[in-house]
Design a protein with these regions (language model features):
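Signature aromatic-anchored transmembrane alpha helix within multi-pass, membrane-resident enzymes
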Residues: 16, 26, 30-35, 183, ...
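Hydrophobic/aromatic-rich transmembrane helices and adjacent perimembrane loops
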Residues: 153, 159, 191, 197-198, ...
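Multi-pass, polyprenyl lipid-linked donor-dependent membrane glycosyltransferases
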Residues: 55, 82, 105-112, 138-168, ...
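Perimembrane helix-loop-helix junctions
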Residues: 13-15, 174, 197-229, 296-300, ...
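Specific aromatic-rich, kink-prone transmembrane helix
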Residues: 117-122, 142, 161-180, 184, ...
């Protein structure tokens, strides 16, 4: 019972009032999520049937297919490694409910990305409490138009769910809901193993912050964050039992544990991480605003931001020290914190400079989706990955008009060999090569392949890879050797270039052996295909009928 102005209200009234409040909050949250999901799905509309790209085709889709078809949580179709099965289970569930298709995969990932953006929005609200304006909406907009988020939101990779559950765990921790934060961390480490950084940071923070004061309660709160450690430990035990290796396979362990710890490689990787976070894609504008706002906004130095900054720094250091591949997508869990900081810092600027800075930052982020940087970068950092997939699809279709096996490298091999990846209706025989280095090509001279598809996996418009400094550093620390060009390979193996695809500075080539017997076999198959489709001529540029 409650007495209000001389009247007594029954407990049932209070329960109804509380329930009504929670219903309004839930309705608003659902509305925000629905709006974000609708925008993301509509924005990605032309890409919803896009074939699988790179690690999707080589690792995560095969692993998810194992769960879907046979219930195997440790993959047989792909090389097993330390990555937990959380994302793959989500895809298997989506396929079970809506059918095994690329469209189902893309929409399932966009719905997951919408949840991640929504949790990032809630985190931005928490981080900007007490500030004027609506910086949380600015942070959400910056995140959604950023090239890395936009590209990754449709791809079946681990780092998007890692971002969402990192943001959720941090939000719950900042609200002192430690048990719920620990449960979110369990889901996080089952999405990606590097998520273990978050519960370790939270547990240590509690013990350090409350040292000497109520140690019993502090230890109980910190102990919750042993749950995700135990969950990840059980997964590693399962890997050890079924594969004989703690991380699934020894090559993965060597490449991701010992290889990055060389001081030179670590320093270079760290500089690259810092450049991407604070300079690239127009981030230098937000960084400048943050430096200006540091003295003006005490909010940026309070406990909330200290926890967030500690987590962001710990994650960036962890993926730098424990990851052989220099992929920017590993930094996705840092972006909600980064864009919240940029949005809050922009509020400290005078109105006119704030409008100019925000406009320029938005323009840079949107432009970075379509404009490639002048140095080598992973295609998955922006929409360049779509151009690469288009070239793969055209090259696969052109090669499939011939009967011979195609010699090429990953990921082109997966485009040809597995129809589930969306490139061909039927598998085409492949001869997988590790690379296009001179030694690899020289080994083919005794038995040249009938067909080859040659391409580069990175753009280099400023010819950075041709400089002496680049060749020395990457040759010494990354075992880099310049791959042979399509022209060089064609001369070495007595082949001719029959097709070439150019897109945004990227080139892919189809080479055909000039041996008369081999050519006769290939042309007979090609003529049969032309007859099937009623004649036609392959375009020299597109490779389509």
């Amino acid at each position: 019972m409650e007495r209000v102005r001389g009247r007594v209200r029954p407990r049932s009234y209070l329960l109804r009032n509380t329930r009504s409040t929670w219903q309004r909050v839930a309705a608003r949250a659902l509305l925000v999520y629905a709006v974000v999901a609708a925008i993301l799905i509509l924005a990605h509309g032309p890409l919803l049937r896009l074939p699988y790209y790179w690690d999707e085709a080589g690792q995560f889709i095969p692993a998810a297919t194992d769960i879907y078809q046979t219930g195997a949580w440790i993959s047989h179709a792909a090389t097993p490694n330390v990555h937990p099965p959380g994302l793959m289970a989500w895809l298997a569930l989506a396929w079970r409910m809506f059918g095994f298709s690329i469209l189902t995969t893309r929409i399932a990932m966009l719905l997951l990305a919408s949840f991640c953006a929504f949790t990032a929005f809630l985190l931005a609200i928490e981080l900007s409490r007490g500030s004027p304006g609506t910086p949380a909406f600015t942070a959400l907009a910056l995140l959604c138009i950023s090239p890395l988020f936009f590209a990754q939101s449709i791809m079946a990779l681990l780092d998007m769910p890692a971002m969402g559950f990192t943001a959720l765990a941090l939000l719950l921790f900042l609200r002192n809901r430690f048990r719920e934060a620990a449960i979110a961390c369990v889901v996080l480490v089952m999405a990606k193993e590097t998520g273990i950084v978050a519960p370790l940071v939270f547990g240590v923070w509690i013990l350090f912050e409350r040292r000497g004061v109520g140690t019993g309660g502090s230890r109980r709160d910190a102990a919750w964050f042993l749950l995700p450690v135990a969950a990840l430990g059980l997964w590693l035990l399962a890997l050890r039992h079924f594969t004989g290796h703690w991380l699934g396979n020894p090559a993965f362990a060597s490449y991701n544990l010992s290889f990055p710890l060389n001081p030179a490689r670590f320093a270079f990787a760290l500089l690259r991480r810092l450049y991407y976070l604070f300079i690239g894609s127009g981030h230098f504008i937000g960084t400048g605003a943050f430096v200006y706002a540091w003295k003006c906004l005490p909010l940026l130095r309070d406990r909330t931001w200290r926890v967030a900054a500690t987590l962001a720094a710990a994650h960036a250091l962890a993926v730098t020290a424990l990851g052989g591949a220099l992929l920017e997508r590993y930094l996705l869990p840092v972006l909600p914190i980064l864009y919240a900081a940029f949005a809050l810092a922009l509020r400290a600027l005078p109105e006119r400079p704030r409008q100019v800075a925000l406009t320029c930052l938005v323009a840079c982020l949107i432009g970075a989706n379509f404009i490639n940087p002048p140095y080598p970068f992973p295609f998955e950092n922006n929409l360049m990955f779509v151009s690469f997939i288009d070239a793969e699809r055209d090259a696969a279709a052109a090669a499939d008009t011939y009967s011979g096996a195609v010699a090429t490298t990953f990921p082109m091999t997966t485009a040809l060999a597995n129809p589930d990846n969306g490139y061909l209706a039927h598998p085409h025989a492949v001869r997988e090569l590790p690379d296009f280095r001179p030694a690899t090509i020289a080994a083919l001279t005794s038995d040249p392949p009938p067909l080859m598809i040659v391409y580069s996996t990175e753009l280099d418009p400023w010819h950075v890879r041709s400089t002496r400094a680049f060749r020395w550093f990457f040759g010494r620390y990354y075992d880099y050797e310049r791959p042979m060009t399509a022209d060089e390979i064609s001369k070495t193996l007595n082949m001719r270039i029959t097709r070439r695809w150019d897109n945004h500075g990227f080139s892919m080539y189809l080479l055909v052996r000039t041996d008369p017997v081999k050519m006769g076999m290939c042309l007979t198959h090609q003529t049969a295909i032309y007859s099937k489709f009623g004649g036609g001529r392959l375009s020299e540029k597109s490779g389509r009928v």
